[in-house]
Amino acid sequence: ATFGLNRTLSEQLRLSIDLTATDLAGTVSSAGVIGFPGTGTEIYTSLQLLASDLIVERDSHIIGLRYNDRERDRNYTLYFNSRFRIGKEFRLNPRLRLDYKSGKLTDNKRLIIRPTVKMEYKVGKWLYLEFEGGFEYRDETFSQIEQTTTGNYIYTGYRGIF
């Protein structure tokens, strides 16, 4: 079952809330295909605050929170996403995402922090040049083994809209 609510708070602000509950039944093995157990009740929630024209004209911002409660774990996500138009051809899109997962049946846990920035430049009527770069910090414990990793990425490309 899913329930969603969208509400305009002001000319610049909108609120969005979604709630989903599932309970998938398991299957039995049959004709050589291995069955799987049911999931139990799983709850997925999402809350977003959407804003526009806050800092500069035609900017947009999303602040969001997600929470998932499943049989084996809980997941929390907090994210920020902004988009700024600079002139007619250039867009700047800074983002930040924080994920935390904790096990219910074990002490497993994971924290991921991902700041990224995307830039887009419009060349002509249909061609866009894109650049995206980001960093990831990951701290996790799995089967009582702690591990911290970091990484960077850079993506460049083009996109045509015909």
Q: What is the predicted role of each segment?
A:
Residues A1-F162:
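Gram-negative and organellar
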